[in-house]
Design a protein with these regions (language model features):
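Intrinsically disordered, low-complexity serine/threonine-rich segments
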Residues: 8-11, 522
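Acidic, low-complexity Ser/Thr/Gly/Pro-rich repeat segments typical of extracellular/periplasmic
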Residues: 24-252
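Ser/Thr/Asn(+Pro)-rich, low-complexity disordered segments
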Residues: 251-657
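Bacterial N-terminal signal peptides that target proteins for export
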Residues: 1-9
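Short, solvent-exposed coil/turn linker segments
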Residues: 2, 55, 119, 163-167, ...
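C-terminal motif of bacterial Sec signal peptides marking the signal peptidase cleavage site
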Residues: 17-20
Length: 657
């Protein structure tokens, strides 16, 4: 009984204790909100530390382990400056009310201190409380950037390259991301011309307007440079800026306008003096270029021999002066280095010794030799055999042309070889094959009465048994022969300074059609301008071999470097008289201040890179004077074709003429 009483008492006490515990638990506070972390992007903010270099467009993400009471968030999560100025922000609660995102409504200031405060007003969904916390951050230092830049109302942001900017009125507007210090502003901005500039600041000193104080060069590339030393008024650094634009072409005629016929005569006369006045004084041959010193070129001098004929006929020199020069030229050709009758590409005009064109090309050059022979044959027909002195010159020319051993240059094969070296033999191993500028080499070889080649050498070697055929249409023009789009225009010049293409044809092509259409393809390609090079147009065209800003190259539609060579369009005048005459007027009147010099048109130009040659090359000068003459009178064509050996040679190869 007593034992039962004790047990009963224990049960009563236990019930009373449990009841008391439950009552006490119900009266305990609900608890505390647990914050997991605060992040800006991938960066976790730490209590008691200042997080630096945060972006000015940052959002703050707050993560909690508890479910929050959304109604308590506004007013409890705050972003303030260090002076307690509040930052208007958008606040979102999401992720089942366990996450808060605070995003400032405007970008924060650069290099400024801020504090993110979460106050005790924040509550959990079950009444949990939060003790409050604060995080310190500093924004990244600002960078001065260009928000907008225009030139004469054209966009000037890289990579845009504005064109046709009025060289007299340049107006560049630049808006920056921060205000500028007006002091010494002009020291940070420059145009490549180096001229003084006018500056105007506006829009709270964030916009600078630059204008020129004097005219810029026309048709030129001009750079705007903004120094990386520029800083904003707040001290923000700048990365620098460089871009360029092209000024518009001044179309005002640079020389008095004269009749076209007079202009053609002027061009011929100026070009003639390259071969006459600038010829090497010791030998009378043409220097390779205007900077080549004693180096004379055989091929270019062959063109120069034909230029002598034009000079006499046009009255630039007397016949006696021309014959005196011819006598000097022949004397040199008779005594200088020769190899099986052929000359080297380059010779020293003072001593007559070979100047290697390349280390292995130090002997005969049969193609260059053929250009000289073309000129000598043409001159031979111009001379008067009834005049004793001229008959002597004719005989000397025969001796020179008959000495060329074309048959030896076949090496017993049905093809001609281009080079031979006295110490390296056939090391160059270059066959002369078409279609290109070397047709005349096979023509003069076939006309030789002393060392001729058979027709099989032409058909198998040059024509490759028909492999030279093309037959495709480009821009609507059929191209009978050669590479796509025809290649450089010197293909239509060198062989045809003497060889008359007007009625020339064989089983492979009509050569008048070939040359006319290749010229028209070149013209059309240029004004179509698929590479958007500056300057190309219907009146500014012509791709051929010439100097260029990087050296020398054979420009063509398939090797377009942005370089226009006047000799290409000018020398095409026999094939494209309208297109060539338009180019001639443009080159002379519009570009003459840049393109016209002592010996006529300079070699080439590339306005895209601001390059204008000051060079003259014999092989570009020769086609100009000779092809203009063939257009005007057919003189050189008629002379060459009148040679009693030429037509039989052409007939042997299967040509009609």
């Amino acid at each position: 009984m007593k034992k039962y009483s004790l047990l009963s008492g224990f049960l009563v006490l236990n019930i009373l204790f449990c009841t008391a515990c439950k009552k006490k638990e119900a009266e305990t506070p609900a608890g505390t909100i647990q914050m997991a972390q605060v992040k800006i992007g991938p960066v976790v903010l730490k209590i008691g530390e200042t997080t630096k270099d945060i972006a000015v467009d940052s959002s703050f993400n707050l993560y909690f382990n508890n479910v929050l009471d959304p109604s308590s968030v506004n007013g409890s999560v705050l972003l303030k400056k260090s002076d307690n100025t509040g930052i208007p922000s958008d606040i979102f609660v999401f992720a089942d009310n366990r996450r808060i995102r605070l995003t400032p409504q405007k970008p924060l200031d650069h290099l400024a201190s801020y504090k993110l405060q979460v106050t005790s007003g924040l509550k959990g969904s079950n009444g949990e409380t939060f003790p409050g916390i604060e995080f310190l951050v500093v924004t990244v230092a600002g960078k001065l950037t260009i928000s907008n830049i225009t030139i004469n109302q054209q966009d000037f942001q890289i990579p845009i390259i504005p064109r046709n900017i009025d060289c007299k009125n340049v107006n560049i507007g630049i808006t920056f991301s921060d205000s500028l210090d007006p002091a010494n502003l002009n020291s940070f901005f420059s145009l490549s011309s180096g001229m003084p500039l006018k500056f105007v600041l506006s829009e709270n000193n964030t916009k600078v307007t630059i204008s020129n104080t004097q005219s810029l060069p026309d048709y030129s590339r001009c750079f705007l440079n903004i120094s990386k030393n520029l800083t904003s008024r707040s001290g923000f650094p700048f990365d620098g800026f460089t871009n360029y634009f092209y000024t518009a072409l001044d179309s005002t005629p640079k020389f008095p306008v004269i009749p076209d016929d007079q202009l053609l005569t002027l061009i011929q006369e100026k070009t003639f003096h390259y071969f006459y006045d600038f010829a090497h004084p010791s030998c009378g041959l043409a220097r390779e270029r205007n900077t080549s010193g004693d180096i004379v070129t055989i091929g270019g001098s062959g063109f120069g021999v034909m230029a002598l004929i034009v000079g006499i006929e046009r009255g630039f020199i007397t016949r006696d002066e021309g014959l005196t020069r011819l006598n000097k030229i022949l004397g040199f050709l008779e005594t200088c280095d020769r190899y099986h009758g052929a000359w080297a590409h380059w010779l020293n005009g003072a001593i007559g010794k070979t100047v290697p064109f390349t280390p292995n090309d130090n002997g005969a050059d049969l193609v260059e030799t053929s250009y000289m022979v073309e000129g000598l044959i043409t001159m031979r027909q111009y001379l008067d055999p009834a005049a004793l002195a001229e008959r002597s010159l004719i005989e000397r020319i025969y001796a020179l042309t008959n000495a060329v051993e074309y048959d030896w240059f076949t090496r017993g094969q049905n093809v001609l070889y281009w080079h031979w070296s006295p110490n390296l033999g056939w090391i160059m191993n270059m066959q002369v094959q078409g279609y290109n500028e070397t047709l005349i080499t096979y023509i003069v070889a076939a006309t030789s009465t002393t060392h001729p080649i058979p027709a099989s050498v032409y058909h198998q070697g040059y024509a490759k048994n028909g492999g030279i055929k093309n037959g495709s249409n480009y821009y609507g023009y059929k191209l009978p022969l050669g590479e796509p789009y025809g290649g450089p225009l010197f293909y239509t010049h060198y062989s045809y300074l003497g060889l008359d293409p007007r009625t020339l044809a064989d089983q492979y092509a009509n050569y008048w059609e070939q040359n006319v259409n290749q010229s028209l393809i070149n013209w059309t390609y240029c004004f179509t301008n698929p590479n958007s090079f500056l300057g190309y147009s219907k009146v500014c065209w012509g791709l051929t071999a010439s100097d260029n800003p990087w050296g020398y190259n054979a420009q063509s539609p398939t090797n377009d470097l942005g370089v226009i060579t006047p000799s290409a369009a000018v020398s095409a005048i026999a094939y494209t008289p309208e297109q060539s005459m338009n180019a001639i007027r443009f080159f002379y009147y519009t570009l003459g201040d840049k393109l016209w010099g002592e010996y006529g048109f300079y070699d080439a130009f590339d306005p895209s890179v601001g390059w204008w040659a000051d060079s003259y090359l014999a092989i570009d000068q020769g086609p100009i004077i000779c092809m203009i003459e063939n257009y005007r009178s057919g003189l050189l064509w008629n002379l060459f074709m009148s040679d009693p050996e030429v037509k039989p040679g052409l007939t042997k190869l299967g040509f009609t003429y």
